């Protein structure tokens, strides 16, 4: 989980809107809206071998496609990137399928990029969902 956390900047945001086409995380409830401090807490909890939400640990498979550069955000090479995904989670003899789209605000960091913000748009974000304890 640390490697995933290290993809984010020190001011990075991770957002799952609760409504389709939700424009602002401050106007209505979100499924997840984490700043860097909350991301660090999430990763620390997920790394704990006794975390109740992940006993037994989920097995997951991720498929990411249709990756596109949607916009160039600065002369320094910062990017807005979009993609579609499917994530299968299997845990306690139960299988769940999540699907949707992601948008990433990426900023130049050395020879690569870091995630300034990540927005995960679940197709069924406005339906009843059991707790989400895996990272996308």
Predicted regions and their residues:
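Short acidic-aromatic low-complexity motifs
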Residues: 1-7
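Hydrophobic pocket/interface hotspot
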Residues: 4, 39, 106
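A beta-strand edge to alpha-helix "cap/lid" segment located at domain peripheries
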Residues: 68-136
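A solvent-exposed, acidic/Ser-Thr-rich amphipathic alpha-helical stretch
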Residues: 10-81
